[in-house]
């Protein structure tokens, strides 16, 4: 069901939706966090995204991390659930997200590269010098 969100939007248009998302925090050896610059909003965010029908939060986190960054990751630990995020996308879609956030670690030694057109670029940032994020609650 890779087009689950598109199918829902075809039915409801831009009306507000509550959707489930998963994201991961990956910290490198320099204690910097990986962020991706999103194509849809031109905001920085943690790699992650919407759950597909039938997926767990952990499965979605691993899948979205691969799509957004090119990295295979494994879940180290859940960090928490955040449920106050509201995003208005440039196309008019309004979404309140319920996000499960995980600490992840990279496996396999791949290079950073985004696998979809959802990511403009990837970069590591020092925790004390983060850019404005798409969803400030995470």
Please place each PLM-identified region on the residue numbering:
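Acidic, metal-coordinating catalytic segment for phosphate/diphosphate chemistry
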Residues: 1-23
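A residue-level structural signature of the nucleotidyltransferase/glycosyltransferase Rossmann-like core
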Residues: 16-19, 32, 43, 122
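Residue-level preference for beta-strand/loop junctions
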Residues: 18, 42, 94-98
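Conserved beta-strand residues within beta-sheet cores
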Residues: 21-23, 72-75
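Active-site beta-strand termini and strand-to-loop segments that position acidic
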Residues: 26-29, 104-106
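Conserved Nudix-box catalytic region and its N-terminal flanking loop in Nudix hydrolases
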Residues: 28-68
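Unchanged
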Residues: 51-74, 84-138
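Local beta-strand/beta-hairpin segments that build beta-sheet-rich folds
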Residues: 79-80
